[in-house]
């Protein structure tokens, strides 16, 4: 039997940090922004941070993995 090799690409979910902070402070939001993307685990072993548009905040914010 052949070995099952994990690929270099993994699917990740990016969430808005501003929406998460507002939910933690007690402010109720209707929803928060979540993007789905892929990353290469060998090129970027650390957590990914991208600046994306958040529709619930209506501005560009940092989204973290």
From Swiss-Prot:
InterPro entries, per the entry: Ribosomal_bL33 (IPR001705), Ribosomal_bL33_CS (IPR018264), Ribosomal_bL33_sf (IPR038584), Ribosomal_zn-bd (IPR011332)
Ribonucleoprotein in keyword set: yes
Keywords, sorted A to Z: Chloroplast, Plastid, Ribonucleoprotein, Ribosomal protein
Localization per record: Plastid, Chloroplast
Matches recorded under PANTHER family: 50S RIBOSOMAL PROTEIN L33, CHLOROPLASTIC (PTHR43168), LARGE RIBOSOMAL SUBUNIT PROTEIN BL33C (PTHR43168:SF2)
Family, per entry: Belongs to the bacterial ribosomal protein bL33 family.
Full protein name: Large ribosomal subunit protein bL33c
Organism: Psilotum nudum (Whisk fern)
